């Protein structure tokens, strides 16, 4: 009789079997895939020996889908059907994208995520990104000789729920099991921390093709803690290309070039940028579709001057991230550069000037994110003990819910470490209330009108009882990928409801930055507004309770003079509550409470007498 192999619950039946897992850097300009071999993280190469896969997808006339270099070669000839930098559009609406005049695509403005019209039909950024992921998966499985267990895919630190979910959806379409989404700066920290055994405060300066992220990290004995993050999701190496592109238009007096010429000039701009990394001048020679020739020379000094405003833009998020972490420049031990754009000399010089020290460039800035993701994937696949490395990401904006008076009660504050779960108890406002609307919000302001709505759901089945008697526990959970779920449960009946927040499309980096800035600017005004609304809510609650008490017991327990005085004080509170003075409202509430103390005592006595009526000492449960 054959023996049945068993194992402890939760353990593999083959605990020492190496599982094939990879780290994927799904980049705006280029994408990579890496894995851990013999304890070392290495990037997997294609058949031509190249590590980078251009994040470009071409929909050919014969129905074939080309990805990478093959697609890139079609950009000049067929720009409308060759989609580059689709990552910029993940989880975004057309209004979020901003200036599209330089893009040759036919955008379809539909509710939710923007779509792009191609000869293969209307394609979403999710579908386009899935083609890139399919290509990386095929490369990995061919190189590793087997089927992947899963992958860790990196995303910019400031990707919100919609953008992260869109990334997961793209992976699902590509047939990839996502072990985890990992912030790109955190992935870089993993790679550098393990290679160099670094400890202390580090800044990860990540300037990719389309996004800029900065993270402040504390590295201590294998623990990577993200203290704060900031950035700009509409700033990257592509913007440096566009500065050269617009410079060419100015020099040649070209106006509104057609899509093919736009692609030719953008390609020439990118090549000039890369040439200037190693040389002091670059020649730009392009023959346009009308036969006209562009022949210009751009010096490194001119290029630095053109792009100085872009460099200055990267310093603003750095200052904000340092302030959020309560750190100064002097406390930073090192700066890690990530992203191909950081090869530009003016970028390295700007970073060195700001921090007063040269940045670290030990690892290839194009590969470092994928290398770190591969290390994390190896751990999550069970190939290493997960106690060897602990990383802690943070959420960029506070999460909370609406309370009476349009106020926001923050449940999870911004920069909280992920994953995280927080619970808080709430109660009903009215007598006999059997349902409660839960409104989930994101932002730093005190009033609902100034924050972003993430979703709503209703909790029904609350047992009818006096206002304030019910206990509803609301739990916020944010997983390691930054996705939020909210649940509410009434403690006595067990009534339960929940929501998983997947917004139709997300916030841009600029909007997030503006929300944070507005919270700082309006802090004092928000404080007064909250105090006023809290006072008004207290007043309304007291007035409603007194009206019910007077209807029930006023005639029995009060004489005419007492009732008139209470009514006068109630009317005074109603009038004061219409004004903008929270102190005056609180004083009126205190005065009304004082005026009704005798009435409250009589009601309590009457309730006790009623409860004891017909009872003897022997029948009481004492």
Curated annotation (Swiss-Prot):
Domain of life, per UniProt, equals Bacteria
InterPro entries cross-referenced by the UniProt entry: ATPase_NBD, Heat_shock_70_CS, HscA_NBD, HSP70_C_sf, HSP70_peptide-bd_sf, Hsp_70_fam, ISC_FeS_clus_asmbl_HscA
**Is-annotated flag, keyword ATP-binding?**
yes
One of this protein's GO BP terms?
Answer: iron-sulfur cluster assembly
Spell out the Pfam families in the cross-references.
Answer: HSP70
Member of which family? Belongs to the heat shock protein 70 family.
Q: What does this protein do?
A: Chaperone involved in the maturation of iron-sulfur cluster-containing proteins. Has a low intrinsic ATPase activity which is markedly stimulated by HscB.
What is the protein name for this chain? Chaperone protein HscA homolog
Q: Which organism is it from?
A: Methylobacillus flagellatus (strain ATCC 51484 / DSM 6875 / VKM B-1610 / KT)
Q: What gene codes for this chain? A: hscA
């Amino acid at each position: 009789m054959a023996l049945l192999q068993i194992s402890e619950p939760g353990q593999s039946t083959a605990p020492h079997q190496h599982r094939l897992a990879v780290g994927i850097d799904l980049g705006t300009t280029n994408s990579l895939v890496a894995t851990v071999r013999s304890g070392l993280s290495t990037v997997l190469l294609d058949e031509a020996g190249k590590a980078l896969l251009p994040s470009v997808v071409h929909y050919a006339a014969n129905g074939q889908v080309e990805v990478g270099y093959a697609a890139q070669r079609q950009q000049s000839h067929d720009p409308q059907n060759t989609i580059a930098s689709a990552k910029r559009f993940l989880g975004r609406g057309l209004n979020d994208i901003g200036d599209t005049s330089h893009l040759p695509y036919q955008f379809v403005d539909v509710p939710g995520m923007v779509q792009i019209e191609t000869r293969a039909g209307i394609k979403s950024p999710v579908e386009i990104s899935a083609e890139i992921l399919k290509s990386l998966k095929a490369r990995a499985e061919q190189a590793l000789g087997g089927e992947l267990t899963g992958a860790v895919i990196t995303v910019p630190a400031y990707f919100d729920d919609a953008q992260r979910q869109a990334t997961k959806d793209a992976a699902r379409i590509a047939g990839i099991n996502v072990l985890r989404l990992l912030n790109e700066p955190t992935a870089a920290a993993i790679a550098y921390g393990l290679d160099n055994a670094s400890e202390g405060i580090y800044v990860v300066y990540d300037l990719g093709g389309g996004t800029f992220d900065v993270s402040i990290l504390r590295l201590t004995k294998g623990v990577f803690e993200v203290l704060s993050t900031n950035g700009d999701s509409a700033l990257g190496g592509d913007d440096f290309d566009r500065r050269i592109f617009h410079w060419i238009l100015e020099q040649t007096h070209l106006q509104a070039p057609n899509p093919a010429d736009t692609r030719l000039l953008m390609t020439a701009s990118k090549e000039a940028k890369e040439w200037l990394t190693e040389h002091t001048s670059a020649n730009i020679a392009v023959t346009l579709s009308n036969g006209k020739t562009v022949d210009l020379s751009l010096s490194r000094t001119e290029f630095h001057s053109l792009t100085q405003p872009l460099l200055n833009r990267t310093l603003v998020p750095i200052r904000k991230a340092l302030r959020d972490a309560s750190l100064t420049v002097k406390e930073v031990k090192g700066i890690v550069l990530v992203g191909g754009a950081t090869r530009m000399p003016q970028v390295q010089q700007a970073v060195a000037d700001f921090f007063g020290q040269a940045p670290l460039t030990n690892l290839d800035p194009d590969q470092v994110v994928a290398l770190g993701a591969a290390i994390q994937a190896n751990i999550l696949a069970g190939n290493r003990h997960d106690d060897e490395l602990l990383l802690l990401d943070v959420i960029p904006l506070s999460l909370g819910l609406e309370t009476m008076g349009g106020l926001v009660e923050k449940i999870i504050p911004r920069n909280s470490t992920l994953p995280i779960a927080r619970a808080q108890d709430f109660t009903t406002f009215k007598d006999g209330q059997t349902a409660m609307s839960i409104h989930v919000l994101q932002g730093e302001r005190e009033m609902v009108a100034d924050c972003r709505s993430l979703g709503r759901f209703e909790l029904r089945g609350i047992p009818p009882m006096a206002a304030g008697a019910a206990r509803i526990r609301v739990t916020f959970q944010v997983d390691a990928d930054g996705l939020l779920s909210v649940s509410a449960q009434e403690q006595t009946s067990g009534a339960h409801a929940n929501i998983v927040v997947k917004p139709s499309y997300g916030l841009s980096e600029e909007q997030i930055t503006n929300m944070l800035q507005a919270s700082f600017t309006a802090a004092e005004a928000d404080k007064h507004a909250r105090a006023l609304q809290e006072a008004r809510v207290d007043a309304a609650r007291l007035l409603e309770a007194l009206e019910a008490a007077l209807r029930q017991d006023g005639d029995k327990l009060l004489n005419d003079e007492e009732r008139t005085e209470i009514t006068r004080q109630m009317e005074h509170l109603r009038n004061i509550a219409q004004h903008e003075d929270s102190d005056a409202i609180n004083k009126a509430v205190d005065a009304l409470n004082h005026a009704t103390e005798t009435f409250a005592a009589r009601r309590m006595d009457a309730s006790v007498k009623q409860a004891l009526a017909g009872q003897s000492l022997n029948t009481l449960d004492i």
